[in-house]
């Protein structure tokens, strides 16, 4: 009986995620049946109405904020709205995918071959409702309240998702973004570095949670100091943070979201904040996350690295017509979202 592997491919924008997934799709080197879920570009640019462009909205907002034409409160309102719009297609398709395969039993995915199925997904929902908002908070375009609101509304994603984070130098990323000249995109190396660091910090957060108990993580979060003015804030702006297998709490996303504003006069943290962080803890703790360094690699080599990861992550047994339903759903979505 065949197996189904769903692997999310993520990371900063302009680094080649879509190119890698296309390479896997078209390569004759693999015997398993494969498909990839494309970025929902139509939804981002003109979902139902032609003048709804969430990507342009964010970049325009950042430019207005930088020019002093709008304040942080207005910029944050606009960015938060745009991030919700960007997240919606991911939430929908995540529910579709797991609605089809959630009842299937787990299986080993080693050595995918003929009769097996690979579904590559261009971004996990966490990218648009966690990673990008965190990066925009760090760079001063999103208020703390709106960041926590976005994190608090994370849906209950199925546990155990597998994510391959592609990592590329900021210099090469900037070159690729300039080369592709996508409408509305701008090259801001400070933002690119911070966004790249957010994805690495997310990986480090998963590694940290793998090493500590729930109670220890909760105690560590209480001991964290305000992010603003911290060493982590400085590092996120100035250096390329590296993946670690044994990070401490001060090197995680929890440290980025640590704020004096969460403490009450009775010296207790806001219960709502504590519960929000516990929800994020539970979600991240369940993930299978891998870093793929793609610096200096060809498209074929990048594809090989991603496929190699697919043989190390959980799979589900392909029963009945589940594979056909899954592939039909992805094809319908891709046809609708293409621009």
Swiss-Prot record:
Organism classification: Viruses, Duplodnaviria, Heunggongvirae, Peploviricota, Herviviricetes
Catalysed reactions, semicolon-separated: thymidine + ATP = dTMP + ADP + H(+)
Annotated catalytic residues: 39
Binding site for substrate: 59, 83, 182
Gene Ontology terms describing biological process: DNA biosynthetic process; TMP biosynthetic process
Pfam families: Herpes_TK
Top-rank lineage group of the source organism: Viruses
Function statement: Catalyzes the transfer of the gamma-phospho group of ATP to thymidine to generate dTMP in the salvage pathway of pyrimidine synthesis. The dTMP serves as a substrate for DNA polymerase during viral DNA replication. Allows the virus to be reactivated and to grow in non-proliferative cells lacking a high concentration of phosphorylated nucleic acid precursors.
Species for this entry: Psittacid herpesvirus 1 (isolate Amazon parrot/-/97-0001/1997)
Protein keywords: ATP-binding, DNA synthesis, Early protein, Kinase, Nucleotide-binding, Transferase
This protein's name: Thymidine kinase
Known partners and oligomeric status: Homodimer.
Amino acids binding ATP: 11-18, 176
Record family assignment: Belongs to the herpesviridae thymidine kinase family.
Keyword Nucleotide-binding carried by entry: yes
GO MF annotation terms: ATP binding; thymidine kinase activity
HAMAP family hit by this protein: HSV_KITH
Gene: TK
Signal peptide residue numbers: none
């Amino acid at each position: 009986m065949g197996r189904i592997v769903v692997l999310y491919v993520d990371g900063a924008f302009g680094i080649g995620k879509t190119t890698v997934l296309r390479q896997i799709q078209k390569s004759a080197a693999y015997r398993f049946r494969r498909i990839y879920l494309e970025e929902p570009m139509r939804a981002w640019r003109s979902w139902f109405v032609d003048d709804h462009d969430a990507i342009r909205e964010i970049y325009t907002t950042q430019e207005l904020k930088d020019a002093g034409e709008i304040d942080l409160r207005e910029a944050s309102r606009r960015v938060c709205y745009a991030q919700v719009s960007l997240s919606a297609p991911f939430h929908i398709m995540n529910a579709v995918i797991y609605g089809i395969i959630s009842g299937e039993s787990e299986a080993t995915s080693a050595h995918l071959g003929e009769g097996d199925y690979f579904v590559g997904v261009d971004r996990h929902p966490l990218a648009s409702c966690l990673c990008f908002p965190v990066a925009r908070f760090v760079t001063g375009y999103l208020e703390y309240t709106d960041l926590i609101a976005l994190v608090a509304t994370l849906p209950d994603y199925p546990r155990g998702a597998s994510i391959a984070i592609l990592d590329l130098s900021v210099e090469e990323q900037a070159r690729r973004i300039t080369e592709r000249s996508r409408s509305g995109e701008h090259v801001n190396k400070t933002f690119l570095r911070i966004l790249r660091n957010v994805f690495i910090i997310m990986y480090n957060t998963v590694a940290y949670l793998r090493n500590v108990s729930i109670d220890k993580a909760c105690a560590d979060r209480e001991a964290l100091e305000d992010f603003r003015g911290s060493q982590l804030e400085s590092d996120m702006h100035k250096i390329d943070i590296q993946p670690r297998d044994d990070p401490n709490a001060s090197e995680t996303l929890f440290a980025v979201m640590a704020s004096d504003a969460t403490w009450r006069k009775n010296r207790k943290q806001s219960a709502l904040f504590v519960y929000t962080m516990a929800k994020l803890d539970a979600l991240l703790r369940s993930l299978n996350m891998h870093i793929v360094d793609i610096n200096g690699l060809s498209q074929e080599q990048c594809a090989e690295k991603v496929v190699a990861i697919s043989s190390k992550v959980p799979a589900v047994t392909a029963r009945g017509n589940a594979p056909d339903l899954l592939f039909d759903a992805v094809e319908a979505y891709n046809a609708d979202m293409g621009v």
